[in-house]
């Protein structure tokens, strides 16, 4: 007995895939669209409507006539179930198992319904879906330079921040200069004060009596002033203590 050629066998298998296994009618793009259940079995939409009309399934659920697996029916509409896109493409191409190239092969919309329809019910032993994603490098325009262009964003408030920072820097420099000048002046006055006695003696020896007397009397006069100031401060404290009312 001669075996059938592989081409005829493939065509017969393809034609079997295009038929509903309940009514054995050919799928079409109108009333008999191939619907995929959650158990990956295919049933035409017309048979699903009949199953719902017979009342064999609970409300909002369709029981698979092959494996009795319950599939939730979104919005209680058969049209909400995902279509088998492989069968639809085959029907669009003439139903002879030919592969049609999509209009845009580089783009594929992945949704739960689309992924469910991509799983072929005839291969129930495989529960794996392999998706290959390739990145196509676009050719750069010759008018564009190879040097990357970097744009800097300068907010409006950045100028005010810069001005405040500049003013703060100037203020710090001025304050530091003032403090340094005060320290130098204090050191010079201290050096002049402690060297006034030997300097006055030197001026007296040099016959400069007036300046010599001033410098010589600087240290004793300052000490007398400090003593008078301390005495007056003590007297004021005692006077305030006497004038204060008793507690």
From Swiss-Prot:
GO biological process terms on file: protein ubiquitination
Main subcellular location: membrane
Q: Name the catalysed reactions.
A: S-ubiquitinyl-[E2 ubiquitin-conjugating enzyme]-L-cysteine + [acceptor protein]-L-lysine = [E2 ubiquitin-conjugating enzyme]-L-cysteine + N(6)-ubiquitinyl-[acceptor protein]-L-lysine
So which tissues is this one expressed in?
A: Up-regulated in neuronal cells subjected to cell death-inducing injuries, such as oxygen and glucose deprivation (at protein level). Could be up-regulated in Alzheimer disease brains. Highly expressed in innate immune organs such as lymph nodes and spleen and in immune cells such as macrophages and dendritic cells.
This protein's pathway: Protein modification; protein ubiquitination
ZnF bounds (RING-type): 20-68
Task: Quote the EC number.
Answer: 2.3.2.27
A molecular-function term among this protein's GO annotations: ubiquitin-protein transferase activity
Q: Mind telling me which InterPro entries this protein's record contains?
A: RNF182, RNF182_RING-HC, Znf_RING, Znf_RING/FYVE/PHD, Znf_RING_CS
Q: Name one GO cellular component term.
A: cytoplasm
Q: How does it assemble?
A: Interacts with ATP6V0C.
Its function?
A: E3 ubiquitin-protein ligase that mediates the ubiquitination of ATP6V0C and targets it to degradation via the ubiquitin-proteasome pathway. Also plays a role in the inhibition of TLR-triggered innate immune response by mediating 'Lys'-48-linked ubiquitination and subsequent degradation of NF-kappa-B component RELA.
Q: What is known of its domains?
A: The RING-type zinc finger domain is required for E3 ligase activity.
Q: What is this protein called?
A: E3 ubiquitin-protein ligase RNF182
Q: Which organism is it from?
A: Homo sapiens
Q: Which gene encodes it?
A: RNF182
């Amino acid at each position: 007995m001669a075996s059938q050629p592989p081409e005829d066998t493939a065509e017969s298998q393809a034609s079997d895939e295009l038929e509903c296994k309940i009514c054995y009618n050919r799928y079409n793009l109108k009333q008999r669209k191939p619907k995929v259940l959650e158990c990956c079995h295919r049933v035409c939409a017309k048979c699903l409507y009949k199953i719902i009309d017979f009342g064999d399934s609970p409300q909002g659920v369709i029981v698979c006539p092959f494996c009795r697996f319950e599939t939730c029916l979104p919005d209680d509409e058969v049209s909400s179930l995902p279509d088998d896109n492989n069968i639809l493409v085959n029907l669009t191409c003439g139903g002879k198992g030919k592969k049609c190239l999509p209009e845009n092969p580089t783009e594929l919309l992945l949704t739960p319904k689309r992924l469910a329809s991509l799983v072929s019910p005839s291969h129930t032993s495989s529960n794996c879906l392999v998706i290959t994603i390739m990145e196509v490098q676009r050719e750069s325009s010759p008018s564009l330079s190879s040097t990357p262009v970097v744009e800097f964003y300068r907010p409006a408030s950045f100028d005010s921040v810069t001005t405040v920072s500049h003013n703060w820097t100037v203020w710090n420099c001025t304050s530091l200069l003032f403090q340094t000048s005060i320290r130098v002046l204090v050191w010079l006055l201290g050096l002049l004060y402690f060297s006034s006695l030997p300097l006055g003696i030197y001026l007296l020896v040099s016959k400069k009596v007036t300046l010599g007397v001033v410098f010589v009397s600087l240290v004793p006069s300052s000490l007398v002033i400090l003593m008078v100031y301390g005495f007056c401060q003590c007297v004021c404290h005692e006077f305030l203590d006497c004038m204060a009312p008793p507690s």
